[in-house]
Amino acid sequence: MNLKEAEEKMQKAIEATKNSFNTVRTGRANASLLDRVMVEYYGSPTQLKSMANIGIPDASTITIQPYDKTSLGLIEKAINMSDVGLTPNNDGSIIRLNIPALTAERRQEMVKKTAKLAEEGKVSIRNIRRDAVDSIRKQEKNSDISKDESRDLQDKVQKKTDKYIAKIDELLAAKEKDMTTV
């Protein structure tokens, strides 16, 4: 693994962390809250967003209008079974999800969940660093590169690691600020 590959993988880890942050409730309506909701549709799990139009009419409401009206009950069941923590209101053609204001206790739970997701992102980046350093050491052992080049490359990998971990910390701080602001 070279430095460029390691950096690309670290960038992907950042994107994955951002996406996982988007699934955490902040007290505002956001279509990405439903990204992980899978609906059992004709025997196979299907992403909700691929079988319905998801709208945000106001800051505290999400509307779900399925392309196939017969799937309303299945969507409602999938939302109830998911860990979204919202109760669907089915009016026969549209499902509405009202987003209640988060209590201080619930906000703290969400902050902890976000911190855990950030830590998973950091671990992922550290694993990429470990793989890159192992690859560099292997090249040094095989005499493909000198000891000085090896040390230089390992330092560069560490600097990239520090940069991307700092980026995750920035994302976490911004998300926590978003969640704790009422």
Curated annotation (Swiss-Prot):
Query: What is one cellular component GO term in this UniProt entry?
Result: cytoplasm
Alphabetically list the UniProt keywords.
Cytoplasm, Protein biosynthesis
Q: What is this protein called?
A: Ribosome-recycling factor
Cleavable signal peptide: none
Please describe what this protein does.
Answer: Responsible for the release of ribosomes from messenger RNA at the termination of protein biosynthesis. May increase the efficiency of translation by recycling ribosomes from one round of translation to another.
Q: Which organism is it from?
A: Trichodesmium erythraeum (strain IMS101)
List the InterPro entries hit by this protein, alphabetically.
Ribosome_recyc_fac (IPR002661), Ribosome_recyc_fac_dom (IPR023584), RRF_sf (IPR036191)
Q: Which residues cross the membrane?
A: none
Q: Which HAMAP family match?
A: RRF
Q: Which family does it belong to?
A: Belongs to the RRF family.
Which gene is transcribed and translated to give this protein?
A: frr
BP-aspect Gene Ontology terms: translational termination
UniProt-annotated location(s) = Cytoplasm
Specify the domain of life of the species encoding this protein.
Answer: Bacteria
Determine if Zinc-finger is one of this entry's keywords. no
Which intervals of the chain are annotated as region Disordered?
A: 136-156
Supply the NCBIfam families for this chain: frr
What GO MF annotations does this protein's record show? ribosomal large subunit binding
Major subcellular site: cytoplasm
Q: Does the keyword Transcription regulation apply?
A: no
